[in-house]
């Protein structure tokens, strides 16, 4: 998301506590709180339908927003939590944290896989097994990437993609030091089964 910062428009919530939050929900709003920085926590509310649309669009929690609340200066925020109804799975409350563009934060970033047709292993019927569809990275708040890209060109059956083999966006680094696996290309089940049978036959002949 190293481009234009999208606006998140909210209203200041006059009341606080569970009663005020319930009233906000009855009015078709989702209550929330803005915290962090040098200012006091700010109770807010966002129209339910608007928030739901943004959540369905994806990557809401890995997007830096320009929060606009009437009567307050615009501030950059990131969502730290969205509470949901346990039955309906609909948003009931959200927590936003104030940030500076230079702040370092940890976020889960989506992994995109490209050039499937250029992977010999997939052409032979191999299966791309994604171990981590998202990777936690430490990034700068003003330069949050939409995704990281894994190039499958030249990969064969049995090849493994680790974090060290991926080119990360400038300023981003994994939160885990070990060289963890992101994906691999495994043999199709039929080929794997025949290989296992061949190994069994070889073992029997040696006996």
From Swiss-Prot:
SUPFAM superfamilies, A to Z: Ribosomal protein L25-like (SSF50715)
CDD domains for the chain: Ribosomal_L25_TL5_CTC
UniProt keyword Secreted, yes or no: no
InterPro entries in the record: Rbsml_bL25/Gln-tRNA_synth_N, Ribosomal_bL25/Gln-tRNA_synth, Ribosomal_bL25_b-dom, Ribosomal_bL25_C, Ribosomal_bL25_long, Ribosomal_L25_dom, Ribosomal_uL5_bac-type
Signal peptide stretch: none
GO biological process: translation
GO cellular component, one term: cytosolic large ribosomal subunit
Superkingdom field: Bacteria
Pfam families found in the cross-reference section: Ribosomal_L25p, Ribosomal_TL5_C
Keywords assigned by UniProt, alphabetized: Ribonucleoprotein, Ribosomal protein, RNA-binding, rRNA-binding
MF terms (GO), sorted A to Z: 5S rRNA binding; structural constituent of ribosome
Family recorded in the similarity comment: Belongs to the bacterial ribosomal protein bL25 family. CTC subfamily.
Function: This is one of the proteins that binds to the 5S RNA in the ribosome where it forms part of the central protuberance.
PANTHER family in the record: RIBOSOMAL PROTEIN L25/GLN-TRNA SYNTHETASE, ANTI-CODON-BINDING DOMAIN-CONTAINING PROTEIN, RIBOSOMAL PROTEIN L25_GLN-TRNA SYNTHETASE, ANTI-CODON-BINDING DOMAIN-CONTAINING PROTEIN
Subunit-structure text: Part of the 50S ribosomal subunit; part of the 5S rRNA/L5/L18/L25 subcomplex. Contacts the 5S rRNA. Binds to the 5S rRNA independently of L5 and L18.
Protein name (database record): Large ribosomal subunit protein bL25
